[in-house]
Amino acid sequence: MPVLHNRISNEELRARMLAETEPRTTISFYKYFTIDDPKATRDALWQAFTALNVFGRIYLAHEGINAQISVPESNVEAFRAALYGFHPALDGVRLNIALDDDGKSFWVLRMKVRDRIVADGIDDPTFDASDVGEYLKAAEVNAMLDDPDAVFIDMRNHYEYEVGHFENALEIPADTFRAQLPKAVEMMQEYKDKKIVMYCTGGIRCEKASAFMRHNGFQKVWHIEGGIIEYARKAREQGLPVRFVGKNFVFDERMGERISDDVIAHCHQCGAPCDSHTNCKNDGCHLLFIQCPACAEKFSGCCSELCKEEMSLPEEEQRRRRAGRENGNKIFNKSRGRLNTTLGIPDPE
């Protein structure tokens, strides 16, 4: 039986990726369709994609597949053929090509089987995920933005919205998609007779969100085909005004794609205009936050003086302090006042 997981350290894998000379293309795609045996599907795709030197992150579940990957340019067409030929439901699936790509988005292939490809918290057996809203193409999106009867809803997390969004789009304040769905229904009650336009990064969240809105009685629901990535690409190709302002946050090493020159966010430490996300350099923290170059130098890439001080301690003492400390997925949120008292950083819960 072949080894169907990685046995090489992250450090070595990253070094190998950085040493590559062939350009890579960053691609994202998703598809809601029934997978009878996600584990067997995962193993078969692992072997096919490993043979093409694909890196990235792929989730599979009974409800479908969600993938963000990078592929060597010389293997893109072979990858497309392998994917399209793997299952009838994947034949012709839309591939979102990254807009602002240095080819260094991933350095390892990780494939996991999950309960859902997007954690939605929906347990209503009458919910029909296929009853989605209508797709909008780039020109139609711009027309809707000028329609006073239309309301745009951003179905991304607060840290994504903070650095970029469509003009006048409403933010659903939440840290997870699971928490956003009921909030969106609640917030949109006063707009129930309006045209509801939902969007996200690549389409996977807003597609399910549009079905959830329809499930809750909203009839005039649209969502942007291919999300922000496809909208910006098509608008540029067609010579249309790009009405997304700022940066599109992405979940890979790039942490963002520049859509417009506007910088609408601010450094979380000094307040200077900045939209560059980073993770705190303290291994016991890794808080996701926005930091300008001046503060990066001042705090040595850390989110606080406390983290900077901890970084200067002997490694053994740092490990002792990290032991037992909750870590991972910490996100700066200006709307919360509670702090992690150990480090003096915002609590992610």
Swiss-Prot record:
Active site: C200 (cysteine persulfide intermediate)
Top EC class of this enzyme: oxidoreductase
Protein name: tRNA uridine(34) hydroxylase
Bias type Basic and acidic residues, positions: 314-328
Keywords tagged on the record: Oxidoreductase, tRNA processing
Alphabetized HAMAP family for the sequence: TrhO
Function: Catalyzes oxygen-dependent 5-hydroxyuridine (ho5U) modification at position 34 in tRNAs.
Organism listed in the record: Cronobacter sakazakii (strain ATCC BAA-894)
Catalytic activity from the UniProt record: uridine(34) in tRNA + AH2 + O2 = 5-hydroxyuridine(34) in tRNA + A + H2O
Region (Disordered) residue spans: 314-349
Residues covered by the Rhodanese domain: 146-240
Origin: domain of life: Bacteria
Similarity remark: Belongs to the TrhO family.
UniProt record, GO biological process: tRNA modification
Entries under InterPro entries matching the protein: Rhodanese-like_dom, Rhodanese-like_dom_sf, Rhodanese_C, TrhO, TRHO_N
GO MF annotation: an example: oxidoreductase activity, acting on paired donors, with incorporation or reduction of molecular oxygen
Presence of keyword Plastid: no
EC number: 1.14.-.-
